[in-house]
């Protein structure tokens, strides 16, 4: 695993563009809180505003995915150490989907924030770059509920691309948009080890199918 960027998608993605790496800066974070009106903390160590209201949010996760519960607990621990209260909402699979998916909520997503398990296939669907999870108009996913006109224009440019160069340019714009607005945050970038015969080289790596994909048969050569 490796440290992700603000642009969310990992380097193996077609159209990847390097953006600022994520990191922890508690001084900068405290300044952001102050800019938002949170300068004091209560007896429990949580930030409060001028009206005495605690800075808090609910983090939803799927109880059926043990690793996701662990991620949620880690996020809660780190944010509460800093001063933001996190209320964990651990739901069964059906209840989780009903709060986080357009399809299963009948276009009424109600979660504040959630731990999502994005798949390699989902990352590449439609216009790619995890856009189905961000796009509020997507009929199935759309968890981030983004309806921004600039975002939609970028998706259109990606969908209308006729060449790899055109797609890469639009994909770069999307990653810049992710970096600027951060509708979603990657907790880490995963990694894989793919084994192959030493007699061959020039494999094409696919995020979904690994080395065994159609493009490999056009690129592979014997040593």
Map each language-model feature to its residues.
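Solvent-exposed loop/turn segments at secondary-structure junctions
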Residues: 1-4, 13-16, 63-67, 93-95, ...
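Periplasmic binding protein-like
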Residues: 80-135
């Amino acid at each position: 695993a490796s440290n992700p960027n603000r642009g969310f998608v990992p380097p193996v993605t077609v159209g990847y563009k390097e953006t600022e790496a994520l990191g922890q800066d508690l001084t900068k974070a405290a300044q952001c809180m102050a800019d938002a009106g949170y300068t004091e903390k209560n007896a429990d160590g949580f930030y409060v505003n001028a009206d005495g209201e605690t800075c808090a949010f609910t983090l939803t996760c799927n109880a059926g995915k043990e690793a996701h519960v662990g991620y949620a607990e880690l996020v809660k621990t780190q944010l509460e150490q800093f001063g933001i209260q996190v209320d964990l909402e651990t739901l069964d699979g059906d209840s989780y989907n009903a709060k986080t998916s357009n399809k299963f909520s009948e276009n009424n997503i109600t979660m504040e924030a959630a731990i999502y398990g994005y798949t390699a296939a989902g990352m590449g669907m439609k216009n790619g770059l995890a856009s189905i999870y961000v796009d509020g108009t997507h009929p199935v996913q759309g968890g981030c509920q983004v309806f921004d006109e600039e975002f939609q224009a970028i998706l259109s440019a990606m969908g209308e691309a006729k060449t790899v160069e055109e797609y890469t340019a639009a994909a770069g714009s999307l990653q810049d948009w992710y970096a600027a607005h951060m509708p979603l945050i990657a907790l880490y970038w995963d990694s894989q080890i793919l084994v192959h015969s030493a007699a061959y080289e020039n494999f094409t790596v696919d995020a979904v199918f690994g080395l065994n994909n159609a493009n490999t048969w056009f690129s592979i050569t014997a040593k």
